[in-house]
Regions:
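Active-site core of glycosidic bond-cleaving carbohydrate-active enzymes
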Residues: 1-173
Length: 173
């Protein structure tokens, strides 16, 4: 993240402006290619979530796209239809824009692949992927890892939003 690099440069006495300029250029180019009439041209939950999370949209656009993101999840039966990168941002975005209830319903959903589904099938740690019981070529898939941290964004959500334990700022603040 170029804005984080700018912050680190400032903290270490280096020039932050090259990073800030790069961030502005990235945002400008992203918007020129992917934003039309205030809407993201790619209509997938990962694209929406990441564009909102990274500040690529203006606030009014982000609010409208967060509502669209929420509706996609509701329409999909309260299930995540994204991969790792979408999972990284979706908890923060939906909570920030007032859709924590949708997240809760999605996380606790036992009917579709996800966190609740895994727990309802005996998992007490995070599997490598949620589709651990999908049959491929007549055989069940094998979950290689039953303690896969990369899907643990839900843990951060529990601490930061449900329990209210939040990081005060970047670094050691």
């Amino acid at each position: 993240d170029t804005l984080m690099m700018a912050h680190m440069a400032r903290l270490t006495g280096r020039d932050e402006q090259p990073y800030r300029t790069l961030a502005e250029n990235i945002r400008r180019d992203f918007r020129a290619r992917y934003v039309r009439e205030g809407r993201l041209t790619v209509r997938h939950i990962t694209a929406l979530s990441m564009a909102i999370f990274t500040g690529m949209l203006d606030e009014d656009e982000a609010k409208a796209e967060a509502a669209a993101l929420n509706q996609m999840i509701v329409d999909d039966g309260y299930q995540f239809t994204c991969g790792l990168h979408g999972m990284r941002t979706i908890f923060d975005v939906l909570t920030r824009y007032g859709y924590a209830e949708t997240l809760f319903k999605t996380v606790t959903n036992t009917q579709h692949y996800g966190y609740g589904y895994s727990v309802s099938h005996g998992f007490r740690t995070l599997p490598e992927h949620f589709a651990f019981d999908v049959k491929l070529a007549g055989a069940r898939t094998r979950v290689c890892s039953r303690n896969h941290h990369y899907m643990s964004f839900v843990d951060t959500w529990f601490f930061e939003y449900l329990a209210g334990i939040q990081v005060l700022g970047f670094g050691q603040e």
